[in-house]
């Protein structure tokens, strides 16, 4: 197994977050306040003033040195940009000792003791307290989370759907059986029709005159009927066409 790289200490990560990524100086509560641009990058106020003095950005706009995103200045003042509240809290706690630093630099657990340590007579010049409010999610009990819960839902119309499906299956089977029977009957009639002439001759030879005449005359009579039907159909079409012509 490949060994994982050693993780950096939490104190080093916190100190790295408290440094400006341009001048690498530590943020403070005076000239180097952490300012947040619209692209969510943090730059100290002193570096922002230098960027404005260099004239690289248009009037009333600051171009982010990291992603070149333009941030509008509300009053053409760097002080109008929002501060990074989490870093301000860390800076305030850092002046009180390491025990005030939270485990997660983006979270601040509020307790009466911690609030008392933040607000002291030595901070009479401060007129605001920055607080990050987070919603704590309640963890479910281990007994419930370890056991999978499976719910079965049976709709009220389940029985009716089953009945309709069964009836549809029966109807399909009946329809298929009927179609098969019709096909078999048509094949039998066709076989009887085409074999009627030799069968009639055989019956005449066997001295069964009546049946022999019927079977022998079946094919010619059917052909005559078809010819008469076709002739009548042609006459009817011609008559209808003549009636449809304008007089």
From Swiss-Prot:
Record-listed E.C. numbers: 2.3.2.27
Phenotype when the gene is knocked out: Silencing prevents ventricular remodeling in rats after myocardial ischemia-reperfusion injury by activating the mTOR signaling pathway.
Chain segments annotated as coiled-coil in the UniProt record: none
Membrane topology (UniProt): Multi-pass membrane protein
InterPro entries: RNF182, RNF182_RING-HC, Znf_RING, Znf_RING/FYVE/PHD, Znf_RING_CS
Pathway membership, UniProt: Protein modification; protein ubiquitination
Gene Ontology MF, one: zinc ion binding
Catalyses which reaction(s): S-ubiquitinyl-[E2 ubiquitin-conjugating enzyme]-L-cysteine + [acceptor protein]-L-lysine = [E2 ubiquitin-conjugating enzyme]-L-cysteine + N(6)-ubiquitinyl-[acceptor protein]-L-lysine
SMART domains for the chain: RING (SM00184)
Subcellular location per the Swiss-Prot or TrEMBL entry: Membrane; Cytoplasm
PROSITE patterns: ZF_RING_1, ZF_RING_2
ZnF endpoints (RING-type): 20-68
Transmembrane segments: 184-204, 211-231
Main location: membrane
A Gene Ontology cellular-component term: membrane
Listed GO biological process terms: protein ubiquitination
UniProt keyword terms in alphabetical order: Cytoplasm, Membrane, Metal-binding, Transferase, Transmembrane, Transmembrane helix, Ubl conjugation pathway, Zinc, Zinc-finger
Known partners and oligomeric status: Interacts with ATP6V0C.
Summary of the function given for this chain in its UniProt record: E3 ubiquitin-protein ligase that mediates the ubiquitination of ATP6V0C and targets it to degradation via the ubiquitin-proteasome pathway. Also plays a role in the inhibition of TLR-triggered innate immune response by mediating 'Lys'-48-linked ubiquitination and subsequent degradation of NF-kappa-B component RELA.
PANTHER family attached to this UniProt entry: E3 UBIQUITIN-PROTEIN LIGASE RNF182 (PTHR46675:SF2)
Domain comment (free text): The RING-type zinc finger domain is required for E3 ligase activity.
Stated name of the protein: E3 ubiquitin-protein ligase RNF182
